[in-house]
Structure formats: structure tokens, C-alpha cells
Amino acid sequence: MELVLQDTQKSLTVSNNIFGYRFNEALIHQVIVAYAAHTRSGNHAQKSRAEVVGSNKKPWRQKGTGRARAGTVKSPLWRSGGVTFAAKPRDYSQKINKKMYRGALKSIFSELIRQKRLIVVEQFCIQAPKTKLLVDKLKKITLKKVLIITHLLELNLLLAARNLYTVEICDIANINLISLVTFDQVIITANSIKQIEERLI
């Protein structure tokens, strides 16, 4: 498969087995759900009726008062009572093996190419950590919400993109699958795409 570099118009040869992979929506969904679940702290905690502090005395006698019967002030029906099915701390993380992760990554990159949302450039850098320089450079390429993937993180790019909510910078070691799916377009350097290809073989 041949990819054309947008800045130099050179041709870059990549593996069709990786960047021409079939679209597997179910696998992508499973991996992204697991990825998102892993970020959950899971430290929610509520008290059941057994854990609420208070007297176990019956509030009033069973019959003769005209009021609804009550056996405890800790009842979930009462204010300040326990919760019926109290949430407890739990681990939400799901196991995703390497084969599934690689399959999802290949499927996402292949679909980005098919949808013409992947922009490959020879290199992507700016001379100074100025937001204006980055905006001017992006205007020549795209005006959409964009994810920029570089081989190594550059300080100038990171500082320039800090206050641009439509731009995210990452290196190939920290590719976020959720960002790959949600951003309108992905800009990636030629060196980065070859590194990704080596990892996914």
C-alpha cells in the first residue's frame, strides 16, 4: 500500500496486512470499553441498612397507632436510612490481551485511511513554543479537531498546543485509542507510522 506524504508529496510504502486490515467494529468497541473502564477509580461506597449507625429499637409498636408499621430507623425507605443495594468499591478493569489490542489498532488505522482521515507528513515541528505558529501550520493542513502523533514528544509542540482544545499531541508510546476514534483527523509523521508498523507486525 502506498501513502502520499502531504507536505513533500513523496510516496511511503506500508504493509497492506496492517493498514489495509478489515474493519472489526465489535473488537474496537470491546477494547475501547476496556480502556475507558480502566480509568475508573471504582471507589464509590454506600452504606447498607446493616452498616448505618443507629438504634435497633422498633420506632413504635406494630399496631394501634394508625401509622405505617416500621421495624427500624435504618430502613432504606426512611430518610438517613441505608441504601437497598449499596454500591461498594470494585475494580472495573477488564483484561485485553496483546492480540486484541493490536487487532483493534490495525482496524482503526485502516479505517482512518479508508475514510481519508489520516494525514501523513514527513515531519511535524515548530521553531518556537508559540500557539500562533502551530495554528498557522495546522491551517495549511486541516481546520478540524486533530490528533497529532509524533515519534518523540517535542516540547515546542506540547507548549503550543496546551490551550487548544481541538488539538492533542501524543507520541507512539502513548497512543490513546479513544482519541484515535473521536478526533476528526489524525496527523502522523512518516517515522511514526513506520514504527507503528514494526510494532504491529
From Swiss-Prot:
It holds the Pfam family Ribosomal_L4. GO terms for cellular component: ribonucleoprotein complex; ribosome. GO terms for biological process: translation. Keywords: Ribonucleoprotein, Ribosomal protein, RNA-binding, rRNA-binding. One of its GO terms (molecular function) is rRNA binding. The keyword Signal does not apply. Part of the 50S ribosomal subunit. Belongs to the universal ribosomal protein uL4 family. This is Large ribosomal subunit protein uL4.
